[in-house]
């Protein structure tokens, strides 16, 4: 797993460097304009406008190559052997790489200030674009790094044969909830659409799967329920799971009565008796799946399992839920970074574009 995480981080480093090349090219164009007297000699006899057009085209191609590559820089996938603290460590490392990207963007702004007047219109515009991008990257970095300690040395979806469930640690749940809520806010502030929860209940295609919620019991489930739990998780998307979690509140309590359509993912994660969890089929599947994902990823959390080795099916449901949630979070981060970098590039391109006479 460490080798896989290292490979992912290396790919992210390559992506960051490609983006910095793009931005450096933009600043480099500024320097070419400043040195008009020697421009033709420095460009092999071509006109300055020809050089600018060629460099601009290269910058555009490199930028979109970066955006294509960034789609492959994440992609941590949980297996039955993945430990909870490995997921937390991955998020922490990803946050560190966003911090490095922010530092590199700062160098772009400094370069523009050195090569031109610090208070000149081009340098000021580049500084503003970089600072805006850095603010979002810094926000994402902080919340991703806060997830470092949410797990422990148990496997994701931890369950044991014929054992009752255990609710996750409150501090871990609250930290995870706050981080996810803040990441979603940063995304929407950057122009990304917020995830939406669906209305699917625990009855799917005429099949009642309410017993699958018993994997979140704090007592023994009383029957093999792992497969029904997987059916619940499979009925919803990662986006719906994420939306159900961020709609929760820290103060949402464990179930002291029967679950219904208003029961949140946080309450499901904290659990209740098997009877309260499975009393009706009206709860939202996304909320149950969100509860399974939270309990599967956060320290101390344990899913309830029946005997006859049914813990394998229970853990499988936890792994599916965790992967769906992680994919949704990763997708949101990619979209956010993409929007932020595109906006920064647009502003920098506009700042270095030749001005018509009278607009200098």
UniProtKB/Swiss-Prot annotation:
Lipidation positions, renumbered (N-palmitoyl cysteine): 27
Highest taxon, organism lineage: Bacteria
SUPFAM superfamilies membership: Variable surface antigen VlsE (SSF74748)
Keyword annotations: Cell outer membrane, Lipoprotein, Membrane, Palmitate, Plasmid, Signal
Any Pfam family: Lipoprotein_2
One GO cellular component term noted in the UniProt record for this chain: cell outer membrane
Bilayer topology annotation: Lipid-anchor
InterPro entries: Borrelia_lipo
Disulfide bridge positions per record: none
Intracellular or extracellular location(s): Cell outer membrane
Lipid attachment site numbers (S-diacylglycerol cysteine): 27
Signal peptide start-end: 1-26
Keyword Membrane applies: yes
Function per UniProt: The Vlp and Vsp proteins are antigenically distinct proteins, only one vlp or vsp gene is transcriptionally active at any one time. Switching between these genes is a mechanism of host immune response evasion.
Family: Belongs to the variable large protein (Vlp) family. Alpha subfamily.
Miscellaneous information on this protein: Genes for both Vlp and Vsp families are on (usually) unnamed linear plasmids in B.hermsii HS1.
Name of the molecule in the record: Variable large protein 18
Species annotation: Borrelia hermsii
Lineage of producing organism: Bacteria, Pseudomonadati, Spirochaetota, Spirochaetia, Spirochaetales
Gene: vlp18
